[in-house]
Amino acid sequence: MQKNILIIGAGIAGCSLAHFLANSGWNVTLLESEDGIAQGGSGNPVAAIYPKFMLNDEAYNDFMLKSFRFTTAWIRRLGLNEVDYRFDGAIEILEEAYAQKLEINLSRKITKKENFFSLINESILNKYLIECNSSGLFFHQGGWVNPIALCSHLINHSNIKIVTHQKIKSIEKSIDQWTLKTESQKTFNSSHVAICNASSVNQFDLTQHLHTDAFRGQINWINSTSFQMPPIVTCDEGYLAPLIQDKHVFGATYAMNDFNKDLRKSDTKKNIASIKKIHREFYNHCEAQKSIHGRVAWRASTKDRKPYVGRVFDNQLLGKMRVRELARFGSRGFTFAPYCSYVLTNLINDNLSQEDKKTLNYTNPERYRLKKMSLKKVASQVFRV
């Protein structure tokens, strides 16, 4: 029996899910509203991949750690061209007291921590050309990936069909299948649907209750410089990427529910200011430029920073929840989305591990609705672990 699924959205979430499903025997139709894949928040020249931990949120840190370890190991195995990814390390600059507290917390959680992270010291600063008075953490497996190269690689499969210029207007349920209608009056039918279109997911009746905020993000870049630059991803108030495709990318600004598509000089100035503590010479170089390239895109996020991964309730057919949600990854999309796509594939294939169930309980898309129904405990225990 053929297994067919429609996936709405061809960013990192949709492409990752298509990849895992196709490799497990599904025929996937990937529907994208733009003229190509990875055109939204997944379309920047580089995506930094490193774990962003919280000081007092153990559940979030567990999820972050699982996602980061899965994604970096998985990308290494994919067979991407060597110029399209690198995991030589990443530095997160933090206040010294905060870094020390975080180091203590992570040391309890991570075995063989010396292989995973280190407190920044003088030798690390010298090696990676960072300002000498900095403090923070060095993540040994952190790095970056070329987003478009990764997404293109993921959908290069005979079971995946890509259909662009398809802006989905509605999702409707008949007796045994879902019907997706586009603004151009086309229809697509399938027994299974996955919604992976970031902040646009609220447009559907089925998912309009899922809270989301759209964040406008602007990045900038400068072409290669004549002086030495840090060879790894370095993050402070903003991030600075190493030379990739003859560009040093840095940023990013974030503005909630701001839908201005134009590059802003004020945001460029903010991005330049955000790298001042990382590399003073590069900061001065950027300050002296008359014009700097950039890009604007939107990311979706939730109130609690947790993505939506799992089943969406069908109000009329609660027993047949064959619509899945995979969205709202915020700025951590390339860290979270591959792992969450893998877990969602296991849900669709009815092949969940105990760890998968823990993740789906944590990312349950219906958590806010269940809490409003005084079912807070149920929201985090949809799957028995």
What residues fall within each predicted segment?
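Short beta-strand to alpha-helix junction loop
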Residues: 56-67, 95-99, 137-153, 262-267, ...
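Helix-loop-beta segment of a Rossmann-like dinucleotide-binding subdomain
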Residues: 55, 81-92, 118-155, 253-257, ...
